[in-house]
Amino acid sequence: MKMHPLIKVYGSLTYRDPKTAKEDAEAMTLVNQVKKRFPHLLFMHIKNEGKKTKAQADFDKAMGMLAGASDFVFLGTPPLLLEMKRKDNTLSTWQPNQQMFLLKAQEQGCKVCVALGWEAAMEAVEDWMRIKK
């Protein structure tokens, strides 16, 4: 998986393990850890993955769903947009528009990143907490 040079990556790009946890499991662990360690934070997961019928995709688009939207949005100034990938990034792929979404959000003042696994995502959240107002 090729990373865009303008998007901050948390985690090791050289880590390899074919048995590394799936992205969904990493995301659930992140949610549990953030709620446990930082219960005051407001954040949400954007359900923008999976197969959809054309009718469902059209409905979601009409309701404001954006192709490529990040997995997590943490509310604050600036907001943090976090794209979660598997710890072994060779087992992950970019979906269409994900990198473009992050770059556009970054241009508008958001802190954006890709996190390889939940531990890397926690590091990103902790870094963001040091700069947010």
What are these regions (language model features)?
Residues 1-133:
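Catalytic phosphate/metal-binding cores of nucleic-acid and nucleotide-processing enzymes, i.e., regions
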